[in-house]
C-alpha cells in the first residue's frame, strides 16, 4: 500500500471512530502528487470511458484523485479499500473523469464529487497547490450548533473560536455557513466553493 493511501484510510477510520460518519455519511478526497501518480501507475486500470463531472474545473485538468465511493461506509474502508475507494483521473478540460482504480464491486465516486473538485480547484489556487484534502464529516457538536445558533458566518465563527483555542489557528478567517441544500449537485458545489471552511 502506498503511504498516501494508508494516510487516507487512517483519516477515514479516525473520523468513523469519532462518530462523524453514520451509515454512508460524509466523504473524503485527496489530490495526488505527480510522483504519487507515477508510483502507482503500474497498478492503475486501463483507461475507461469519460464520465461528465457536472461542473467545470479546468484548474484540475489531468489530475488524479483518491476519493470515497458513493454509498460506501467509512467503517468499511479500513477492511476493504478497493471496494470503498476509487482513484479517478480528470480529462484535459476538467469536465470529465474516469475511474482508474478501485470500486471493484461497482459504484461511482462520492455523490459530492462536484463539490469536492470545485473546492480542490479553489484551494489549489489559494495555497499554490499545497492544500490537497477535502473532508466532509458530520461532526456531532457542530450539527448540534445548527439547531441553536442563527445560520450566520460571524456568529458561528465566534462560537467555534470560543469553544476551542485551536479553532482561530485552524481557520483564522472564520467559517462559512451554508443552509440546508440537497447534497450532491452543482448548486451546493458552487455555494461551498466560495468559502474557505464550510459548516
Specify the residue positions occupied by each region the protein language model found.
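Glycine-rich flexible loops
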Residues: 1-199
Amino acid at each position: 500500500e502506498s503511504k498516501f493511501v494508508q494516510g487516507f484510510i487512517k483519516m477515514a477510520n479516525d473520523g468513523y471512530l469519532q462518530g462523524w460518519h453514520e451509515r454512508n455519511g460524509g466523504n473524503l478526497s485527496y489530490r495526488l502528487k505527480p510522483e504519487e501518480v507515477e508510483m502507482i501507475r503500474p497498478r492503475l486500470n486501463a483507461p475507461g470511458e469519460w464520465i461528465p463531472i457536472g461542473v467545470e474545473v479546468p484548474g484540475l485538468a489531468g489530475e488524479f484523485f483518491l476519493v470515497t465511493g458513493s454509498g460506501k461506509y467509512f467503517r468499511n474502508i479500513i477492511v476493504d479499500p478497493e471496494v470503498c475507494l476509487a482513484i479517478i483521473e480528470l480529462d484535459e478540460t476538467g469536465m470529465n473523469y474516469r475511474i482508474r482504480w478501485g470500486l471493484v464491486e461497482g459504484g461511482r465516486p462520492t455523490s459530492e464529487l462536484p463539490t469536492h473538485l470545485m473546492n480542490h480547484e479553489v484551494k489549489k489556487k489559494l495555497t499554490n497547490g499545497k492544500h490537497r484534502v477535502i473532508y466532509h464529516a458530520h461532526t456531532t457538536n457542530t450539527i448540534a450548533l445548527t439547531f441553536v445558533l442563527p445560520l450566520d458566518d460571524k456568529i458561528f465563527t465566534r462560537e467555534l473560536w470560543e469553544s476551542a483555542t485551536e479553532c482561530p489557528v485552524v481557520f483564522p478567517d472564520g467559517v462559512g455557513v451554508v443552509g440546508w441544500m440537497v447534497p450532491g449537485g452543482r448548486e451546493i458545489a458552487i455555494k461551498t466553493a466560495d468559502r474557505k471552511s464550510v459548516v
